[in-house]
Regions:
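Conserved beta-loop-alpha segment that forms the PLP phosphate-binding cup at the N-terminus of a helix
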Residues: 1-23, 40-43
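Active-site nucleophile and cofactor-binding loops and adjacent substrate-binding regions
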Residues: 1-7, 32-34, 236, 269
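Pyridoxal 5′-phosphate
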Residues: 10, 55-59, 65-66, 77-78, ...
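PLP-dependent aminotransferase-like
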Residues: 19-73
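Active-site phosphate-binding strand-loop segment of PLP-dependent enzymes
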Residues: 62-107
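Active-site C-terminal subdomain of aminotransferase-like
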Residues: 122-239, 245-249, 313
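Non-catalytic terminal extensions of PLP-dependent enzymes
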Residues: 209-213, 217-224, 228-230, 236-313
Length: 313
């Protein structure tokens, strides 16, 4: 399965939990920052749940604005650790307090960060809390096929209690063969991805993951410093493996096009317009070359922006 499946199953569990424990029916909604993954919209479409995307503040979840959007039909709050567009960890501790205050399910989407953040923290980086150490967090999704380095698709979803997890299960009957119970929507799932995920976790172990994630952070730090030295502005203060940056004078999408000409096939943000990198351990080896090409791309755009007065008086 992928991160979408983990998120969909967390939403399904939260919905059924809200029905059973709080009597919520019909017209349900989820309150989330605008930076959350579209998988929540998929879940909302499938289950007829409104997803209210609240504008972010300084690229992070705006907890006060999210609280203002809550009503009697709200079943879930969402935060990311980190969000995919900006690579920033939302203020999960504040969201946890809000979830407790309003008696709501809080899901943390750590599909990107779930298997890098713990090892980055072990390596001495002071990361914000986002896991079950935060009171109020009900469920967490994390992808092994991202920074767990497993084959696609291998995602996981965790619940604070067994009771909460049980609401994820599909339990159907009556049927001529009796009850049919599956942990997810899929009746049949391939075992190859599970075996591959087990193999890579056994092969790397804690020490292996710490070293891999150290290289990721080193690549991000090198690129962040280089970006700033070249006049780019990094969006927020990323601490993991994703970084987004813009330029105050030049269109980042034009720079992105120039980088593609030089063989860099990365990503870009549309709102705000920015360059976007999701870094791996190998990128630490090519960070200097990337910055050199970024500088060339910026210079090319700058020269094209200067009007020519040749042949004029």
């Amino acid at each position: 399965s992928g991160g979408t499946d983990s998120i969909v199953m967390a939403v399904k569990a939260a919905r059924d939990y809200a029905r059973a424990k709080h009597g919520l029916t019909g017209g349900l909604n989820i309150i989330a920052p605008s930076s959350v993954h579209p998988a929540f919209d998929k879940a909302g479409m499938m289950m007829d749940i409104e997803v209210r995307r609240i504008p972010v503040k300084d690229y992070l979840a705006d907890v006060e604005a999210m609280e203002a959007a809550i009503d009697e039909h709200t079943l879930m709050l969402v935060g990311s650790a980190p969000c995919f567009p900006f690579g920033l960890i939302d203020p999960i501790e504040k969201l946890g307090k809000l979830a407790q205050k309003r008696v709501l399910w809080l899901h943390v989407d750590a599909c990107v960060g779930g298997y890098i953040a713990p090892f980055v923290r072990m390596n001495g980086v002071d990361l914000p809390k986002f896991d079950f150490s935060v009171p109020g967090v009900s469920s967490i999704s994390g992808d092994l096929h991202k920074y767990g380095y497993a084959s696609k698709g291998a995602s996981t979803v965790f619940f604070r209690t067994k009771e909460m997890r049980d609401f994820m299960h599909f339990d159907a009957g009556p049927w001529p063969l009796g009850r049919m119970v599956t942990p997810t929507l899929a009746g049949t799932r391939p075992g190859g991805a599970i075996a591959a995920a087990w193999a890579i976790t056994q092969y790397l172990g804690v020490d292996g993951y710490r070293e891999k994630q150290r290289e990721v952070v080193a690549a991000r730090e090198t690129i962040a410093k280089g970006d700033r030295d070249l006049g780019f502005q990094v969006l927020g203060e990323p601490q993991l493996g994703i970084i987004a940056f813009t330029h105050p004078e030049h269109d980042p999408l034009r720079i992105y096009t120039e980088l593609m000409k030089r063989g860099w096939f990365t990503a870009a943000l549309i709102e705000p317009r920015a360059l976007h990198l999701m870094l791996s351990p190998k990128h630490n080896e090519v960070a200097a070359q990337y910055l050199a090409d970024l500088n060339e791309a910026r210079a090319t755009i700058r020269e094209e922006s200067i009007p020519s007065y040749a042949g004029t008086i």
